[in-house]
C-alpha cells in the first residue's frame, strides 16, 4: 500500500508572506519562556475525568476525553520584532509500559469549531463526503472548521522513566551490559517559528497521548520565544492555513483510510503570496497490522498532480532494543 495525500490548488493553502520593516525602530518585548504543563498527567481515567469535557482546576488545565488530552490557553507578548520560537516536550511513563503515539497541538483561533467546544457538546465536526472520506470526520477543513494543527508528533519509548530503575523487576534482567542506564524521561525540541501566527493573541495548546491505562504518562511542555536584537527586524506577516490532520483526538475514526484510497482536498494560494511552504508531519507508527508501524510504506504528497514529497518514514536502528522493553520483550 502507498499512503498518498493529493492536494489540488483551488481552495485554502499553507502560505507564509513576509514583509520588510524598512528602518523603523521597533520596541523590544524581550525573550519569553512559558511552561505550559509541568509533569501533568495524561491518562485514561474515566473515574477521575468522567466526561469528554472536564472543567479546569486552579492550574487552568482542561482534561478532555477522560484525561487523554490536556489543554491550556497560553498568551505570548505582542511582538513587533522578528522572533524564533521553540517547543520542548518532556514525557515519562507513570506506569504505562507501552509505546504510544503522541501529538502536541494548537487549536486555530479562526476555527469556530474546535476540540474544546466539541468536548463541551456545543459543536460537532462538519459532515464529510462519505465517498471521498468515508467516516473520517474532522480531518480536513469544513464549514466554520479548521483542523487542529500539530506542533509536534512523538512516540513514547516503552515505559521510559517508570521502569528505568536498575532494580526494576521488569527491566533489570533485560538491560544489555553495553547500556549504562535507561533514561528517566525523554525530551523533544521542535522549531515552530513558522507556526507562530497560530499562537498570536492567545491560543489553546495541548498534548494528546493515545494511552488506555489509568497510570498513563506525565508530560511537560515549554514554549521559548527568542526576540531579534535588531531594532528594525520587523516581525514578518505570515499566515498558516491548516489542511489536514488525521489524529483521532475526539470521537473520530481510526485513520486507516490510506489503506484503501488517496485523500485529496483543494486549497488556494492567494495572488502575491511569497515564501509558500507545505509542512507535513508523519510517524510510521500507530496503525493496524499491515500499516506503517509494521511494514515500510511509501508516503507521497502531490500538488496539482505533481509529487512534492515522496519518502518512507522508517528507521532501522530501533529493532536491537525492542527485546528489552518492559511490556513484553519481543512480540
Please place each PLM-identified region on the residue numbering.
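Extracellular/secretory-pathway and virion-surface proteins
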Residues: 21-331
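Bacterial Sec-dependent N-terminal signal peptides
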Residues: 1-28
Amino acid at each position: 500500500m502507498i499512503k498518498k495525500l493529493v492536494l489540488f490548488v483551488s481552495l485554502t493553502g499553507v502560505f507564509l508572506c513576509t514583509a520588510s520593516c524598512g528602518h523603523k525602530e521597533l520596541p523590544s518585548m524581550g525573550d519569553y519562556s512559558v511552561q505550559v504543563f509541568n509533569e501533568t498527567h495524561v491518562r485514561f481515567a474515566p473515574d477521575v475525568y468522567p466526561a469528554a469535557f472536564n472543567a479546569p482546576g486552579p492550574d487552568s488545565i482542561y482534561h478532555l476525553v477522560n484525561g487523554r488530552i490536556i489543554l491550556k490557553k497560553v498568551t505570548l507578548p505582542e511582538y513587533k520584532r522578528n522572533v524564533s520560537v521553540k517547543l520542548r516536550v518532556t514525557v515519562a511513563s507513570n506506569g504505562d509500559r507501552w509505546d504510544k503515539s503522541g501529538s502536541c497541538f494548537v487549536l486555530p483561533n479562526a476555527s469556530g469549531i474546535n476540540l474544546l467546544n466539541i468536548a463541551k457538546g456545543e459543536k460537532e465536526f462538519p459532515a464529510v463526503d462519505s465517498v471521498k472520506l468515508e467516516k473520517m470526520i474532522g480531518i480536513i477543513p469544513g464549514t466554520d472548521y479548521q483542523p487542529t494543527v500539530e506542533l509536534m508528533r512523538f512516540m513514547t519509548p516503552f515505559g521510559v522513566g517508570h521502569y528505568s530503575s536498575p532494580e526494576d523487576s521488569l527491566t533489570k534482567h533485560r538491560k544489555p551490559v553495553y547500556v549504562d542506564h535507561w533514561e528517566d524521561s525523554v525530551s523533544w525540541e521542535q522549531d515552530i517559528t513558522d507556526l507562530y501566527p497560530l499562537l498570536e493573541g492567545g491560543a489553546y495548546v495541548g498534548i494528546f497521548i493515545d494511552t488506555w491505562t489509568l497510570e498513563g504518562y506525565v508530560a511537560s511542555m515549554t514554549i521559548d520565544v527568542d526576540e531579534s536584537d535588531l531594532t528594525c527586524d520587523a516581525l514578518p506577516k505570515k499566515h498558516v492555513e491548516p489542511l489536514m490532520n488525521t489524529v483521532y483526538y475526539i470521537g473520530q475514526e481510526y485513520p486507516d483510510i490510506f489503506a484503501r484510497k488517496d485523500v485529496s482536498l483543494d486549497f488556494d494560494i492567494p495572488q502575491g503570496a511569497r515564501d509558500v511552504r507545505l509542512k507535513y508531519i508523519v510517524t510510521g507508527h500507530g496503525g493496524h497490522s499491515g500499516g506503517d508501524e509494521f511494514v515500510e510504506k511509501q508516503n507521497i504528497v502531490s500538488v496539482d498532480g505533481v509529487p512534492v514529497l515522496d519518502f518512507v518514514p522508517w528507521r532501522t536502528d530501533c529493532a536491537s532494543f525492542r527485546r528489552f522493553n518492559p511490556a513484553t520483550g519481543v512480540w
